[in-house]
């Protein structure tokens, strides 16, 4: 569901219809320019973070809502809305008490009933929530500030589930809507208030400082810690993104202050401007990966999958996809380069430039006899298309019959769901990417599953690995997870459900008048200051 401009005006005026037009105009122009930050971000069409996983909707939610727990820069969970909390001796009952000072933008207090309703709504669609509900016997309010989650069996990962992809807490009446019906009130308890009156879908959205928000006292760290707001207003300028050169020109002239994803080919221009700064705020970046159809020849043979692992020259792929080596790195851990559980177990296969002779030998051991290997190529995604061409060329160099199947991304997405042989419309290989930060979450990242038909595209199956993945949910400490991560990675690279192609980190660009921006996987609006 998309909110129309008329709907936004109606929603914004409903709570204060007595305001006159002149008073509204005064309110709209009262914010000083030096206390307003203009950020170039993509269009926001879905306002409900439960209705979509789109990054821009999550960024919106981070501004106006709050969460029970938040993850720091090392992917560790910390209380956010929660003050005191504890778990029973048998690890089956968690009690959470809300901290002081929590209030909705409409002036009413946040209650435990709001939290219970929000958890239940989110759990209907969130993968972590579904795990929680499969183990929960009850989620209930104890009093106005306390709620309890009772479990049928221990779930040591519960704080992490609530921190990584847990619910944005909404008012009980909003959270009472089914997840298929979008919440459009945009009333949260977070550090910013959504300005309905100034909303111009497709052009700009405005967020005003919530002067009544009480931040935590801990310093900000990733999504965790205190969310202190030092500016009066943040405006998302959407229209400026229509043309890459226009967006950079707007940054140079001061029309905007922040550009989240500047065009890679224009980074030298930004770098040469003494008034601008480039910084990789999303330090996890994205990981490009190659998925194989484990159900069909030749990749139903582990030897063929291992052959591809040895063949790939990550640097060649990354250069073709992203160009400047300053913004990419090879990846050898199944968890990427930045997770707290990243490790070097069973990574002896990695060799700069790849190992074509080893790959050729392994294809022979797999019984490969010249069968056609179909690589799905997205013609409307340059990085993916270029990477696909490099992989196809490397396969042909060692005598493999590789064929590119070009289509737009939508066509690729449709075809990758087919489990048939290539002669019946199936596929052998496709390349994609994902936020590296998600790879720290074994229990919510479906690409890290090897449970056959329930797994992500490619449908790998390894029961021994899945037993370890289930064990992850019971662990409570990082040291325990680090040890288990090594066991999992040993099996991962023996089986080879996918092949890593590398990590891409593109910096954000912003005016040097801005300070205090927090490195995170999404752009955060608190803590920044404007000189």
Curated annotation (Swiss-Prot):
Compartment list: Periplasm
Record's signal peptide: 1-32
UniProt entry tagged with the keyword Methyltransferase: no
Pfam families xrefs: SBP_bac_5 (PF00496)
Source superkingdom: Bacteria
Stored InterPro entries: Peptide/Ni-bd, SBP_5, SBP_5_CS, SBP_5_dom, TAT_signal
PTM summary: Predicted to be exported by the Tat system. The position of the signal peptide cleavage has not been experimentally proven.
Assigned GO CC terms: ATP-binding cassette (ABC) transporter complex; outer membrane-bounded periplasmic space
Keywords: Periplasm, Plasmid, Signal, Transport
GO biological process assignments: peptide transport
Main location: periplasm
GO molecular function, one term: peptide transmembrane transporter activity
Keyword Signal annotated: yes
PANTHER family tied to this protein: D,D-DIPEPTIDE-BINDING PERIPLASMIC PROTEIN DDPA-RELATED (PTHR30290:SF38), PERIPLASMIC BINDING COMPONENT OF ABC TRANSPORTER (PTHR30290)
Role, per record: Probably part of the binding-protein-dependent transport system y4tOPQRS for a peptide.
Family as reported in the entry's similarity comment: Belongs to the bacterial solute-binding protein 5 family.
Record protein name field: Probable peptide ABC transporter periplasmic-binding protein y4tO
Organism this protein belongs to: Sinorhizobium fredii (strain NBRC 101917 / NGR234)
């Amino acid at each position: 569901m998309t909110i129309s401009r008329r709907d936004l005006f109606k929603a914004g005026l409903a709570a204060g219809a007595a305001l006159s037009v002149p008073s509204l105009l005064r309110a709209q122009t009262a914010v000083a320019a030096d206390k307003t930050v203009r950020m170039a971000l993509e269009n926001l069409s879905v306002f409900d973070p439960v209705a979509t996983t789109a990054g821009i909707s999550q960024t919106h939610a981070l501004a106006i809502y709050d969460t029970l727990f938040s993850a720091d820069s090392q992917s560790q969970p910390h209380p956010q809305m929660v003050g005191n909390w504890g778990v029973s001796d048998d690890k089956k009952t968690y009690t959470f008490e809300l901290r002081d000072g929590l209030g909705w933008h409409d002036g009413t207090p946040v209650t435990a009933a709001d939290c219970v309703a929000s958890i239940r709504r989110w759990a209907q669609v969130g993968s972590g929530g579904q795990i929680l509900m499969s183990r929960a016997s009850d989620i209930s309010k104890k009093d106005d500030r306390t709620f309890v989650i009772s479990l049928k069996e221990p779930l040591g990962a519960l704080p992490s589930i609530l921190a990584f992809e847990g619910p944005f807490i909404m008012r009980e009446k909003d959270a009472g809507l089914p997840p298929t019906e979008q919440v459009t009130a945009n009333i949260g308890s977070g550090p910013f208030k959504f300005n309905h009156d100034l909303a111009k879908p497709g052009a700009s959205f405005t967020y005003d400082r919530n002067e009544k928000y009480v931040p935590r006292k801990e310093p900000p760290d990733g999504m965790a810690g205190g969310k202190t707001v030092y500016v009066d207003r943040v405006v998302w300028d959407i229209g400026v993104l229509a043309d890459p050169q226009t967006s950079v020109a707007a940054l140079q002239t001061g029309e905007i202050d922040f550009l989240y994803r500047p065009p890679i080919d224009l980074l030298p221009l930004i770098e040469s401007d003494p008034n601008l700064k480039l910084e990789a705020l999303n330090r996890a970046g994205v990981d490009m990966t190659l998925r194989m159809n484990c159900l069909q020849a030749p990749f139903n043979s582990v030897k063929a999958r291992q052959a591809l692992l040895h063949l790939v020259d990550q640097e060649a792929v990354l250069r073709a996809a992203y160009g400047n080596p300053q913004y990419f790195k090879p990846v050898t851990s199944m968890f990427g380069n930045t997770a707290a559980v990243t490790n070097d177990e069973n990574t002896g296969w990695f060799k700069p430039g790849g190992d074509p002779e080893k790959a050729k030998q392994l294809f022979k051991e797999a019984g490969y006899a010249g069968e056609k290997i179909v690589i799905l190529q997205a013609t409307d995604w340059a990085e993916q298309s270029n990477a696909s061409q490099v992989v196809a060329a490397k396969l042909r160099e060692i005598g493999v019959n590789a064929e590119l199947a070009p289509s737009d991304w939508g066509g690729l997405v449709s075809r990758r769901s087919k489990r048939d042989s290539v002669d019946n419309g199936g596929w052998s290989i496709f390349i994609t990417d994902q936020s590296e930060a998600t790879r720290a979450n074994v229990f919510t990242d479906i690409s890290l599953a090897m449970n056959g038909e329930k797994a992500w595209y490619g449908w790998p199956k390894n029961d021994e690995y899945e037993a370890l993945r289930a064990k992850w949910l019971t662990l409570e400490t990082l040291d325990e997870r680090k040890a288990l991560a090594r066991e999992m990675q040993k099996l991962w690279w023996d089986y080879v459900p996918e092949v890593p192609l590398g990590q891409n980190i593109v910096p954000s660009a912003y005016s040097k008048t801005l300070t205090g921006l927090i490195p995170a996987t999404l752009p955060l609006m608190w803590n920044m200051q404007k000189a």
